Regions:
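Short Gly/Thr/Asp-enriched flexible loops that form oxyanion-binding sites at enzyme active sites
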Residues: 259-271
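Phosphate-binding glycine-rich loops and their immediate beta-loop-alpha structural context
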Residues: 141-252
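Flexible glycine/proline-rich
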Residues: 20-23, 35-44, 49, 54, ...
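Structural motif
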Residues: 73, 89-90, 98, 111-113, ...
Length: 409
């Protein structure tokens, strides 16, 4: 028999705020309360994807010496001016030239390299050339790549593979970086079980928080997932307090809606402040955006597609902001709708789209719009944002698709 609940026991949404307003408001509040991220020094070889805390300048030049850029012979360029096929020149080893390989030191009096394919061997001590070279031709001078004292990477730069190579070439072995923002993740719900547990009716595998773990890593954070907690006010409260103490921000999975056992809003209000409860997006409306002890605490809906869009629109920019990174927009393509698409009118809707190229143009087809259909995200090539207060789009209409992955032509 269904439980009869007094309406006063249910949560009420404070307000369904427009997405842009909600994001702007919450990020401003987050930034105002943010302290400078902690720093640490790490080996350059282990800093891929980490953000620099300060500018890094080269300690040495690269190359550190004048180096041969080719296999061949090093020569005195001014002494072979004018040689050609009609007037070749025979050179003597140790007097006029030395054999060199790529990377070998070029020392005085030599100042150019003739490529080995332009050298004819006469005997063990002599070669003939019929092609001149310019001063310093085929020589990498000191500092051609990096000059000692040169800026290699600025502060707040997310280090890439090529940056690591340049740092090492510039004599840098360690670099000061911002510690990765630590994000605590609390799965809630009596029905939640870990992946691999024996399944029974009424139980749901916790996949959302594993998705959060992966996304946090992708955006430069360090996830700290806790064991699932049941729908018990005191237990969830203790879990939140522990997570807030141990992390830079906290995500609470499920419990953000208006049910009698959705405790997230009440707990955030008790322990801190609720800035926003309810955003005018579909899926993702029940999002809770708050602060406890000055740290961002975000209540994320339990439906997986809702969870993804709340994460992308709120959690992602908070993580990026903690390390001074830009929230770069996804690439957008123009595509023609394959069929009519009706709007919800009340909300900005994120419609998952399948895209392909037909007859020289992109065509987009909407996938299942349910908030619980994870496979609509897996199969989607992109997202169509359908603004609120419009009736939708007609078949054949051109729309903007935000790409989640490259589209096969």
């Amino acid at each position: 028999m269904a439980k009869i609940v007094d309406i006063s026991e249910r949560n009420l949404y404070l307000k369904n705020e427009d997405l842009d307003d909600a994001v702007s408001k919450y990020l401003k509040m987050t930034e105002a309360g943010r302290t400078r991220a902690a720093e640490e020094t790490v080996p350059v070889t282990g800093c891929l994807g980490i953000v620099t805390a300060e500018p890094v300048f080269a300690k040495i030049s690269s190359p550190y010496y004048n180096a041969s850029a080719m296999d061949g012979i090093c020569v005195k360029a001014l002494e072979i001016v004018g040689v050609d096929e009609r007037s070749p020149r025979v050179l003597t080893l140790h007097e006029d030239f030395e054999f060199v390989d790529t990377g070998d030191v070029i020392e005085e009096p030599y100042n150019a390299v003739v490529m080995i394919e332009d050298v004819v061997t006469v005997d063990d001590a002599h070669v003939r050339i019929a092609k001149p070279v310019a001063l310093w031709q085929h020589v990498r001078p000191i500092g051609e790549d990096i000059v000692a004292g040169e800026l290699i990477v600025p502060a707040f730069h997310k280090l890439r593979a090529m940056d690591i190579g340049a740092l090492l070439a510039g004599g840098i072995l360690e670099v000061a970086v911002l510690k990765k923002p630590r994000a605590g993740i609390i799965p809630t719900g009596t029905e939640i079980v870990e992946a691999g547990s024996p399944m029974e009716k009424g139980k749901i595998i916790d996949s959302n928080t594993r998705m959060f773990e992966a996304l946090i890593k992708e955006y430069g954070g360090e996830p700290a997932r806790y064991a699932p907690v049941p729908d018990d006010y005191a237990v969830i409260k203790a879990a939140i307090q522990k997570a807030v103490a141990e992390n830079d921000m906290v995500l609470i999975s499920a419990g953000s809606s208006a049910g009698t056992e959705d405790y997230t809003r009440a707990l955030v209000e008790e322990l801190g402040e609720v800035a926003i409860h309810g955003v005018a997006i579909k899926p993702g409306k029940p999002a809770i955006l708050g602060f406890i002890e000055g740290k961002p605490v975000i209540g994320i809906p339990g439906y997986p597609v809702s969870a993804y869009f709340v994460f992308e629109n709120f959690v992602k920019p908070v993580i990026l902001g903690m390390t001074h990174q830009l929230n770069v927009s996804r690439p957008v393509i123009k595509a023609t709708l394959s069929k009519r698409l009706m709007s919800t009118l009340k909300y900005l809707e994120f419609v998952r789209m399948k895209c392909g190229k037909v007859g020289g143009r992109f065509v987009a087809t909407p996938l299942d719009r349910g908030a619980g259909v994870t496979m609509s995200l897996v199969n989607a090539d992109g997202i169509l944002r359908v603004p609120k207060n419009i009736e939708g789009y007609e078949a054949g209409q051109e729309v903007d698709i935000e790409l989640l992955r490259p589209v096969e032509e």
